[in-house]
């Protein structure tokens, strides 16, 4: 198996391909991408045998912006016989992986592929049973073992392979399944909820998304992102010239500042979270977020950067490099992650954690 399959949002295949080519080159792996626009996936074929596995191990999946999932795969299996689709899949997996902990039979995130989902669910059960008989899959799911992926791109056609649990997306199809809360002011609330799932390990939620923390939401109106903070019992400074949802104001957890998000400065030093979803040039938003981190006005920030029409990966990489350079120049040790989330469209979501910023327990509000 000398290929890597990557899932992405349909329409962003070129960005996904540019990114994996760049990241693979950084670890000395070279190859070429097969891209079909609108397909929702990319196949990166390595020149050297064994390099696909190296990518799966050594290219930090959490560091990829446009990929929703990454796994090693072999040649496309075509025209699987309806009377026995399982044997060719088993044959391709033999010798590639053993004692895997999980099976995922998946499709791309397109309207055409979603018609295959019903089949995938039915096919999973007999395939899982046979994989266990062949000892390719453990009898009991084990989330610390490799994951087997069977990725159908059309009826009877699939890529088969594996990913490592320490370097993949834990979500089926790489998409967190979130339900829109009926009382949320806008659907944008799902962006921030997804960002929490993607950027913050669940075991750290109790500490890093704790009740009673203070937060600032820049460009808050009508309150989609503020809703997520309030739901976690945080006290929120909502900054926007527009109106906030009355339901949020009635909680007593929100203070509305009718001001420009680019000019607002906090008066207290107890802000843990800064969130920002403003429609503005990405470089301007990035500069604002950098200022907040440098001044230690917050400990962690999640914000959106609107994507340009052309060279989207290159522009985003440039902006993120600039943030890293400015923070390093100021002696700030920060962890930066960025992802084109499922609930993002023409933007990406960025997370910055100031590792050395001490949380101050005083809670002025």
Swiss-Prot record:
One of its GO terms (molecular function) is S-adenosylmethionine-dependent methyltransferase activity. GO terms for cellular component: cytoplasm. S-adenosyl-L-methionine binds at residues 188, 221-224, 240, 260, 277. The keyword rRNA processing applies. InterPro entries: RlmM_FDX (IPR040739), RlmM_THUMP-like (IPR048646), RNA_MeTrfase_FtsJ_dom (IPR002877), rRNA_MeTrfase_M (IPR011224), SAM-dependent_MTases_sf (IPR029063). It is found in: Cytoplasm. Its main location: cytoplasm. GO terms for biological process: methylation; rRNA processing. It comes from the Bacteria. Its EC number is 2.1.1.186. Belongs to the class I-like SAM-binding methyltransferase superfamily. RNA methyltransferase RlmE family. RlmM subfamily. PANTHER family: RIBOSOMAL RNA LARGE SUBUNIT METHYLTRANSFERASE M, RIBOSOMAL RNA METHYLTRANSFERASE FTSJ DOMAIN-CONTAINING PROTEIN. Catalyzes the 2'-O-methylation at nucleotide C2498 in 23S rRNA. This is Ribosomal RNA large subunit methyltransferase M. It comes from Proteus mirabilis (strain HI4320). The gene is rlmM.
């Amino acid at each position: 198996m000398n290929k890597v399959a990557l899932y992405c949002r349909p329409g962003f295949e070129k960005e996904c391909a540019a990114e994996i080519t760049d990241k693979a080159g950084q670890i000395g792996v070279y190859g070429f991408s097969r891209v079909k626009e609108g397909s929702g996936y990319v196949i990166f074929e390595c020149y050297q045998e064994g390099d696909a596995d190296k990518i799966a191990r050594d290219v930090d999946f959490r560091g990829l912006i446009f990929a929703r999932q990454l796994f090693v795969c072999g040649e496309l299996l075509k025209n699987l016989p309806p009377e026995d689709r399982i044997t060719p899949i088993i044959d391709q997996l033999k010798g590639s992986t053993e004692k895997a902990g999980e099976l995922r039979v998946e499709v791309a995130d397109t309207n055409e592929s979603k018609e295959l989902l019903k089949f995938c669910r039915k096919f999973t059960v007999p395939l899982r049973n046979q994989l266990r008989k062949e000892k390719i899959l453990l009898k009991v799911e084990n989330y610390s073992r490799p994951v087997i992926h069977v990725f159908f791109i059309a009826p009877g056609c699939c890529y088969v392979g594996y990913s490592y649990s320490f370097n993949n997306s834990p979500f089926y199809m790489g998409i967190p399944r979130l339900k829109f809360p009926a009382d949320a002011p806008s659907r944008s609330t799902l962006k921030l909820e997804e960002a929490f799932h993607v950027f913050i390990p669940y075991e750290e939620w109790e500490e890093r998304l704790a009740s009673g923390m203070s937060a600032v939401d820049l460009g808050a109106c009508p309150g989609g992102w503020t809703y997520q903070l309030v739901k976690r019992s945080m006290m929120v400074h909502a900054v926007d010239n527009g109106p906030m949802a009355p339901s949020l104001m009635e909680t007593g957890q929100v203070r509305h500042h009718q001001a420009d998000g680019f000019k607002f400065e906090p008066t207290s030093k107890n802000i843990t979270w800064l969130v920002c979803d403003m429609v503005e040039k990405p470089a301007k938003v990035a500069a604002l977020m950098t200022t907040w981190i440098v001044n230690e006005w917050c400990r962690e920030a999640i914000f959106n950067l609107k994507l340009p029409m052309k060279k989207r990966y290159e522009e985003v990489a440039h902006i993120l490099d600039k943030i890293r350079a400015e923070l390093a120049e100021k002696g700030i040790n920060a962890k930066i992650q960025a992802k084109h989330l499922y609930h993002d469209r023409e933007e990406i979501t960025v997370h910055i954690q100031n590792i050395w910023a001490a949380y101050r327990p005083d809670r002025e509000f």
